[in-house]
C-alpha cells in the first residue's frame, strides 16, 4: 500500500518541496494529483533529512500547496520496450505520441541504464558508412564509437543529421536488417520536427528508426530524460535483440541549458559559465553508454550534435564533450558561407578510433594513406592561402599555384556534395585520388609507391 502525502512546502518553477517523508529514494518516480483531478509525474532529485525535492515532468501550473496529493511509486523512471518500438515516436519520458498506442512488454527498463563493465567491453572495429565523403574518408565513424558533431547556430546540422540517418549503413558483411537508428531530439522547434519527419518519410527509413522528441515548448525536466530514454532503447535493441544501433542526439547544448536551469532552481553552486559542477560526469553518463560488449552481437554508436555558443570550441559544453568522446567533427561557418555542404572543417576534426576500423578487410587498403595525404596537402593549402594574401596569388611559386588549385577542387568536389548525394566508400576514395592527382607525384609523400602506381592519375 502506497502512502500519500498532502500539503506541499513550496512550489518553485519545475520543483516541488515536500516535508516529513519516509522511505523515499533518490530518483524515485512520484505521481502528483492536483485539485482538478489531473495527474502529473515527477521524480525525486534531492533528499535533505525528511524533505524531498521533486522535479515535475510537466508544468506546475495549477498546483496549490493545500490541495495537491503526492504518492511515491518506489521505482525509478522505467519504459516498456520490445522490437515493436521500431518505426515509433515517443516523448522524453518514453510515452508514445504517434497515436498508435503504448508499447507492451513483460519487463520494464530503467532509463538510467548502467555503465558497461570495462572488462566486458569489446574494442570498436568496422566502420559505419554515412555516404558523406568528408566523414567516411577523413573522420571515419567506427561501430561502437562516440563521435560528436560540433556545429553552430544557423549551420546545417539538422540537414546533416537527416542525411546520415537516411544513408547510414554498416560494413563488415552484416545484414541491413540488423541496423537501426535511434534519434533523440532535445529542445527543437516545431518546424525542425516537421523537417525531420518529412525527410524520414520521403527516404522510407521510418521502419528502422525510433524517435524520441522533446520540443522547445515541452517541459525542460523531460529534456533531461530524453537522451536517457533513447539510450535505454538503444541498449535493448543492441544487447537483447542483437542489432547495430546508431544513436543521433541533437541538440546536446539544449540538454545542458536545461541542466543549468534546473541546477539554478535547486540553488546549487554554479561552476563555469553557470553550469553545474557535475556537468562533466552528467555528460559522461550519456556518452559512456556507447560501445560493444563481449558475448553480445549488437553495438551502440553515438553521433551527438551540439551547437557551440558563439562558435566557441572552448565553451564548457564542447570542451567537456571532447574530453569524453573519441574525436569530433567540426562544422565551419566559413565553408558554409561558400555554399559548401556539408561544411566539415577537416583540420580540427578527428576520429580517434579510425585507424583500427579502416584499411584492408574493413574499407580499402589505401584508405589510411589517402586520408593522411589529404590532411597534409589541405593543411599546406592553408599556409599557401595565408602567403597569397600577403604577396598576391600571381607571385606564388608554380607548385604553390598547383596547391591553390588542389584546395579549390578539394572543397568544391570532395567536401561539397548534395543533400541527396550518397557516395560509397569506393566512390569517395576514387574521388580523393582524382583530386590528389592534381598535385605532382613528388608532393605525395604520405602514400606508398605501390599505391601511387595503382591509383595516381596525373601525368607526373
UniProtKB/Swiss-Prot annotation:
Name of this chain's protein: V-type ATP synthase beta chain 2
InterPro entries, alphabetized: ATP-synt_VA_C, ATPase_a/bsu_AS, ATPase_F1/V1/A1_a/bsu_N, ATPase_F1/V1/A1_a/bsu_nucl-bd, P-loop_NTPase, V-ATPase_su_B/beta
Molecular function as annotated in GO: ATP binding; proton-transporting ATP synthase activity, rotational mechanism; proton-transporting ATPase activity, rotational mechanism
Alphabetical keyword list: ATP synthesis, Hydrogen ion transport, Ion transport, Transport
Function field: Produces ATP from ADP in the presence of a proton gradient across the membrane. The V-type beta chain is a regulatory subunit.
SUPFAM superfamilies named among the record's database cross-references: P-loop containing nucleoside triphosphate hydrolases
Disulphide-bridged cysteine pairs: none
Gene that encodes it: atpB2
Keyword Transmembrane attributed: no
Domain of life: Bacteria
Similarity section: Belongs to the ATPase alpha/beta chains family.
Any single Pfam family the record assigns to this protein: ATP-synt_ab
Any GO BP annotation: proton motive force-driven plasma membrane ATP synthesis
